[in-house]
Amino acid sequence: MEQRPRGCAAVAAALLLVLLGARAQGGTRSPRCDCAGDFHKKIGLFCCRGCPAGHYLKAPCTEPCGNSTCLVCPQDTFLAWENHHNSECARCQACDEQASQVALENCSAVADTRCGCKPGWFVECQVSQCVSSSPFYCQPCLDCGALHRHTRLLCSRRDTDCGTCLPGFYEHGDGCVSCPTSTLGSCPERCAAVCGWRQMFWVQVLLAGLVVPLLLGATLTYTYRHCWPHKPLVTADEAGMEALTPPPATHLSPLDSAHTLLAPPDSSEKICTVQLVGNSWTPGYPETQEALCPQVTWSWDQLPSRALGPAAAPTLSPESPAGSPAMMLQPGPQLYDVMDAVPARRWKEFVRTLGLREAEIEAVEVEIGRFRDQQYEMLKRWRQQQPAGLGAVYAALERMGLDGCVEDLRSRLQRGP
């Protein structure tokens, strides 16, 4: 009877130990790994931790939630995101030097090279729908100071926006012209602070220069009439007798003999006989004159050139007229000389400056494949639309700042074919 309670106690103790052990085993949870998380991805049979940015996957993990074998990207390669499957890195891009691109940020293991334009240049997309990855080339920013204008908007993503003219300059046509320094001409309204006061000053000086001589002359005339002794008066009879008295005869030397001023055959002027008296030429007496001549006395150095001989033939200007064939752009070799003198990258800007319509440029690009044939066709169409003078070509190149190309083209045209 005493052994049953002991056996029951032993069984109860065993059951208690089993329950405690099962409870303890249920309280210890096995580690879990969720493949749907951001940092764990399932590679094969296991959920592995991925490689960080700038590393590529060398080998996956060998246990659940284990670390994969990752290596750093080699030089000139990168991976900008966390990697779970990539076994190699992407190659870094190179900036296009032909398009004037520069590296704003060099390539690293976690970022690609960032290409852009250097200071003073702006990005010009080569496609109409421009995005960050679109091809582009760099253009120099417009220098508003060189154009004598204020800078309204600095050059960054687009060209510089220039404003009004700087002080000391005024609008004239499409540009800014320096205010005149001469005080005799007109002074534009915007230049009043520069030349307005000078003009008024010199107007006053000119008025003073006119008034002072008048006052001085009036003073001298008054003094002469009131202070100088008067000449004796001559009666009308005495004056008539003096007028009827012939002058004494004088003997003229051979140099004082009469000479005839000869006019050119095609001249409508009258022939006039004059006499050289002393060192001067005077018109001859009425009986020796073939036509009425004004009473003019000429010294030897003032004698008209046609009296001494035929006039010298006028010298002809060596320059050709503006509309002559020599100043017109001829088809054939001259067109190729223009094509060779203009840089290819600025060709479309050149033909736009000449005045070729944008529709014509686009039509040539669609119809003709080769670039050189496109250049020739654009020049040919421009010649057909308006007078194609070499002066227009030189002026367009100078407006584009290609003075060296102007000299090159002139030398090409002088050498000829």
UniProtKB/Swiss-Prot annotation:
TNFR-Cys repeats span 34-71, 72-115, 116-163, 164-192
Please state the span of the N-terminal signal peptide per the UniProt entry. Answer: 1-24
One of its GO biological process terms is: cell surface receptor signaling pathway
Please name the Pfam families in this protein's record: Death (PF00531)
Q: Where is the Death domain?
A: 332-413
Q: Which PROSITE patterns match?
A: DEATH_DOMAIN, TNFR_NGFR_1, TNFR_NGFR_2
Where is it made, tissue-wise?
Abundantly expressed in thymocytes and lymphocytes. Detected in lymphocyte-rich tissues such as thymus, colon, intestine, and spleen. Also found in the prostate.
Tell me the residue ranges located in the Cytoplasmic compartment per UniProt: 221-417
Detail the disulphide connectivity of this chain as listed in its UniProt entry.
C35-C47, C48-C61, C51-C70, C73-C89, C92-C107, C95-C115, C117-C130, C138-C155, C141-C162, C165-C176, C179-C191, C187-C195
Topological domains, Extracellular: 25-199
List glycan-bearing residues: N67, N106, R352
Q: Which UniProt keywords apply?
A: Apoptosis, Cell membrane, Disulfide bond, Glycoprotein, Membrane, Receptor, Repeat, Secreted, Signal, Transmembrane, Transmembrane helix
Output the superkingdom of the source species: Eukaryota
GO cellular component entries: cytosol; extracellular region; plasma membrane
For this protein, the record's SMART domains field holds: DEATH (SM00005), TNFR (SM00208)
Q: Which residues cross the membrane?
A: 200-220
Q: How is it modified after translation?
A: (Microbial infection) Glycosylated at Arg-352 by enteropathogenic E.coli protein NleB1. Glycosylated.
List GO molecular-function terms, semicolon-separated: signaling receptor activity; tumor necrosis factor receptor activity
What is its quaternary makeup? Homodimer. Interacts strongly via the death domains with TNFRSF1 and TRADD to activate at least two distinct signaling cascades, apoptosis and NF-kappa-B signaling. Interacts with BAG4.
Its biological purpose is as follows: Receptor for TNFSF12/APO3L/TWEAK. Interacts directly with the adapter TRADD. Mediates activation of NF-kappa-B and induces apoptosis. May play a role in regulating lymphocyte homeostasis.
Report what the protein is called.
Tumor necrosis factor receptor superfamily member 25
Q: Which organism is it from?
A: Homo sapiens
